[in-house]
Amino acid sequence: MKHLKAFDEAQNDIKAVQKRLSTSSTILSGIQKNMAHLNLLQIGVLSLIAVGSVFAGNPCLKGPPVPKNAAECCVTPFLVEPSAFMTCHSKWIGQTKRQMAMEGIPRGCCVAECVMNSTSLYSNGKIDREALTKLYLASTKSMAPEWNKITLDAIDGCFKMADTIKDEIEAGAKLTPAFEGEQICHPISGTILACMGMTLFAECPAKLFTVNDDCNKLKSYHSKCPFL
């Protein structure tokens, strides 16, 4: 499948994004109380973003358990073409790796912000939800009809989740450069993209999911860990 090799390279850098998305366990408690109406999958997404690498046993830190791209298991709706994502990944992954060793408030994911900027979805700490919805739904037109509702529900859940941790997101946006040339990116882009990727993959209709050991392992892994 086209671009699978490029995506495999991106998955190898998953540790960097875990650092960007991690926050504190106290925030997780508040999120879960306020988001009781969300399904278990969405709570799992909240757990990742709110706890991140706080716990030594975080299953996300080692990356995917198998050398297989998720698109080989289930092709999900997408925001941008793989080539656009890889352009952003190539530009920013060097900085992201350097940020991995930094402590304190999680820094925003510039790969994700670059993706949002490539479609003019990001501006001033805000994501254009209406435009984002149109792009995701446009990608579902040639896909199974079930994806339409799944995508809309995912968008709704992810934006609600982001709203519950807005204080932490804003704190990350107010950081100053820690090393020469560091670009400070707003955490909102990474938060939304991570949530969408995890949710869509987890909700892949059974008839569209390739059932084998590797894909089952990826599904379990990505129920806890993002793709970016």
From Swiss-Prot:
InterPro entries the record matches: OBP47-like_dom, Odorant-binding_protein, PBP_GOBP_sf
Disulfide bonds: 60-225, 73-215, 74-204, 88-114, 110-185, 158-195
PTM comment: Glycosylated.
Cellular component GO terms held in the UniProt record: extracellular region
GO biological process: sensory perception of smell
Expression (tissue specificity): Head without antennae (at protein level).
GO MF annotation list: odorant binding
Compartments, record wording: Secreted
Pfam families in UniProt: OBP47_like
Protein name stated in the entry: Odorant-binding protein 47
